[in-house]
From Swiss-Prot:
PANTHER family: EUKARYOTIC TRANSLATION INITIATION FACTOR 3 SUBUNIT E. Keywords: Cytoplasm, Initiation factor, Protein biosynthesis. One of its GO terms (molecular function) is translation initiation factor activity. Residues 219-392 form the PCI domain. One of its GO terms (biological process) is formation of cytoplasmic translation initiation complex. This is Eukaryotic translation initiation factor 3 subunit E. The keyword Cytoplasm applies. Component of the eukaryotic translation initiation factor 3 (eIF-3) complex, which is involved in protein synthesis of a specialized repertoire of mRNAs and, together with other initiation factors, stimulates binding of mRNA and methionyl-tRNAi to the 40S ribosome. The eIF-3 complex specifically targets and initiates translation of a subset of mRNAs involved in cell proliferation. Belongs to the eIF-3 subunit E family. It comes from the Eukaryota.
Length: 434
């Protein structure tokens, strides 16, 4: 299934350190040649300051067990540079108690005043803290790096030349330390900055494309991520436009989120429209499964695609944890769609559509009825399932209306903002003639 693997293209939009978990994940699969994959990891890790990881990769490639002279020298240089940077920030390193106390850092002005008064803080110390945070990150010491990056965010002005780099670095470090709550906060902060910054159209598109890829890592690991990925990718026009323009392969992750999110079935209609629009640029078993089911009503095709979906998800680092949930919810979607067409269904027919044995299918339906997720009755003698009516709840109708209005409002706001910028530009240009 290498033809459906997105690792290569996803890594193009990720920081070098964020690619390592994806590459290590692939090492446990049989998609690519193991030797070539390890050689690529070694080539990539050589561009960082993670000497121990470099040596470990060399051992896995059956290279020399002893550290080469070049690496010995590099390790000494890394340690020397690290010590020098730590000496430069020594005046604020004494403030580690404040760094650990989040409450005292919420008010930026108060915090800076305290640093200046108690620790003789100067502006040049901020540049040193930034350099140390970046160097610690390059060494793979992500946890310690986050402390200094947080310090920089509190003290720095948003107009500082390094502010955007700090936002990206903080998000990457929190992802790599699996701090998903903080990572989500950093993701939101970075998105707000990108959306409000005075970037050119191309720069904004590039920034959003990178953010989209990084956010997938957060959304599929945070409890609220399944709702947030739908809101951001499907109902924020600027990000939907970035996906359609730069990275239509992200449709895989949006589609997966909708399938496994039973409370957002109202998003299916909008998702299907986008999938159809982008079908000429990107297709995979997950998007094709939804097309088979909701566009063509091809249940046999959906059944076959669901089987392919399992292989795709099993080999995708971003969504592998969703495999069982995806299969369960996809079967439910097949069942619900089939039931809208046929009010009375034989269990054997249903089992065939769901890739299940008849007794497994019957137990599965019984559990659905028992858990109040299905209005139906089973006639065991005839082997039939008789469906009842399933009206859309007022809550679902309200959510659908709100999503629709939200998307339209954001689209109109974007049009007004672009028109305003154009008028301002024309006004400024007119002064050139006087």
């Amino acid at each position: 299934m290498a033809n459906f693997d997105l690792t290569r293209i996803n890594c193009q939009y990720l920081d070098r350190h964020l690619t390592f978990p994806l590459l290590e994940f692939l090492c446990g699969k049989e998609i690519y040649n193991q030797q070539e994959l390890l050689e690529y990891i070694l080539e990539t890790v050589n561009k960082t300051n993670m000497i121990d990881y470099t040596m470990d990769t060399r051992k896995r490639l059956n290279l020399s067990q002893e550290m080469p002279d070049e690496l010995v020298q590099r390790k000494a240089e890394v340690l020397a540079t690290l010590k020098q940077l730590q000496n430069e920030v020594a005046p604020i390193m004494k403030a580690t108690d404040i760094l650990k106390n989040g409450e005292s850092m919420k008010d930026s002005k108060t915090f800076v005043n305290a640093l200046q008064k108690d620790y003789n803080f100067k502006v040049e110390h901020l540049e040193s803290a930034y350099k140390l945070a970046k160097y610690l990150y390059e060494c793979g010491n992500y946890q310690e790096s986050t402390s200094y990056l947080y310090f920089c965010l509190i003290v720095m002005s948003p107009n500082d030349k390094n502010y955007l780099n700090v936002l990206w670095g903080k998000l990457a470090a929190e992802i790599l330390t699996l701090n998903w709550n903080t990572a989500l906060e950093d993701l939101t902060r970075l998105r707000d900055y990108i959306d409000s910054a005075n970037f050119s159209t191309i720069q904004a598109l590039q920034q959003r494309t990178w953010l989209i890829h990084w956010s997938v890592l957060v959304f599929f690991n945070h409890p609220k991520g399944r709702d947030l990925i739908i809101e951001m990718f499907l109902y924020k026009p600027l990000y939907l436009n970035a996906i359609q323009t730069m990275c239509p392969h992200i449709m895989r992750y949006l589609a997966t989120a909708v399938v496994i999110n039973r409370t957002r079935r109202n998003a299916l209609k909008d998702l299907i429209k986008v999938i159809q629009q982008e079908s000429y640029t990107y297709r995979d078993p997950i998007t094709e499964f939804l097309e088979c089911l909701y566009v063509n009503f091809d249940f046999e095709g959906a059944r076959l695609k669901l089987h392919e979906c399992q292989t795709v998800i099993l080999n995708d680092f971003f969504i592998v944890a969703c495999l069982n949930e995806f299969v369960e919810d996809a079967r439910l979607m097949i069942f619900e769609t089939f039931c809208r067409i046929h009010q009375c269904i034989t269990i054997s027919m249903l089992a065939d559509k769901l890739n299940m044995k008849p007794n497994e299918a019957e137990c599965w339906i019984v559990n659905l009825i028992r858990n109040a997720r299905l209005n139906a009755k089973i006639d065991s003698k005839l082997g039939h399932v008789v469906m009842g009516t399933q009206p859309l709840s007022p809550y679902q109708q309200l959510v659908e209306k709100i999503d629709s209005l939200s998307m339209r409002s954001e689209h109109l706001a974007g049009l007004i903002e672009r028109k305003s910028k154009q008028n301002n530009k024309e006004s400024i240009d007119s002064w050139k003639y006087y």
